[in-house]
A protein has these predicted regions:
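Residues that recognize and position ribonucleotide moieties
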Residues: 4-5, 40
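Enriched for short, Lys/Arg-rich terminal
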Residues: 2-4, 10-20, 54-56, 60-91
Length: 91
């Protein structure tokens, strides 16, 4: 499917707080993500706690180490919600 992409404010706020190496890892992951958000290399997985909290199926992709990015699918849109450590799963 051809998705369109956007990010909401928590994502950008937290992205700008990452160090340069983390930002570069996120950019490299983004290249794969743009091709296929469910590519096995990303280890995309549902975050059930956030999904029930927000009423949307929330997914996370692994970027590096403990760094994750969360998103949901809205029709043909992929909406990036947040980026950070496992703490972002707390909602």
């Amino acid at each position: 499917m051809n998705y369109r992409y956007r990010a909401v404010e928590p994502f950008w706020k937290h992205f700008h707080r990452l160090n340069d190496a983390q930002k570069e890892s996120a950019r490299q992951t983004w290249k794969i993500f743009r091709e296929n958000p469910f590519d096995p290399r990303l280890r995309t997985h549902k975050i059930h706690k956030l999904s029930s909290l927000y009423g949307e199926t929330i997914y996370a992709v692994d970027i590096e180490g403990d760094l994750r990015s969360t998103f949901y699918v809205d029709g043909n849109w992929i909406v990036s919600v947040d980026i950070g450590t496992h703490d972002i799963y707390k909602g």
